[in-house]
């Protein structure tokens, strides 16, 4: 095991060189591992990817029901699907002299001239840029004749339309390194180099590395005495593709796809460190990755005012749906919490 030189003052220059050499060797190991990660792997494996949910495609159309309000979900600041003022039974039927009248959450008539909510010639409701305040119950009154000879029929169709956002999801990693003495500045230097290399490794994916924790502890090992170990915890999250260092224009720019690629690169990076150490003929550097200590967890978080609820929103189980009246979410939790005094959609406080 290589160690720092701690001799008399006249050997200070040699001590500095020896200590610097140890840090350099550990850094070189990181650089080589990062380079090898770029080499395509011939081994593939199948995993379950987190699924993004979108209902904003033009091909999706929502039909109503006379029995209950039909739920529809629109991504925040996006165009909505067409909300049809017909039932499934009437969708393909011939309607004579149909007329449509839409009312919004507060009983206001949705006019044809509205810039954000438009009524098509066939009576469909379409939102161009859905805002949080647009969430709520929408009602359409349909009048029509089945045939020219029959009398006018009237239907009332209700829709519960919710804003939703994709979750703020990220990977959280933990790893342990054999370290220099816990009061050594070389542990801090190594930490900085490790984060720099990981950041460069993920630069093309528009992903961000954030250090959550870095602690040095003395660990008693069975049959190995005491040793110093660095405990790292860091997160990997996707940046906005428009704001990242390198703009992502590839067809696989969805955040969860970029995060999955980042996870694979990080796993390979740490595995390469183990392989390189295994091929070394000389002694191990003082700072090195401890095999098998890399752990990761996939974390979903919703923005304040939004939450996931499989029971309430079974058609959008992985969406962060705006909190309904009677609930709120004050921070980046997963679920909306009960609040009887909350009367608005998207509440962030409970008064």
UniProtKB/Swiss-Prot annotation:
Keyword Transport: no
GO cellular component terms listed in the entry, alphabetical order: acrosomal membrane; acrosomal vesicle; extracellular region; nucleus; zona pellucida receptor complex
Organ and tissue specificity: Expressed specifically in testis.
Description of post-translational modifications: N-glycosylated.
Domain of life: Eukaryota
Bilayer topology annotation: Peripheral membrane protein
Glycan attachment positions: 114, 187, 340
Record's function text: Plays a role in acrosome compaction and sperm morphogenesis. Is implicated in sperm-oocyte interaction during fertilization.
The protein's name: Zona pellucida-binding protein 1
Record lineage: Eukaryota, Metazoa, Chordata, Craniata, Vertebrata
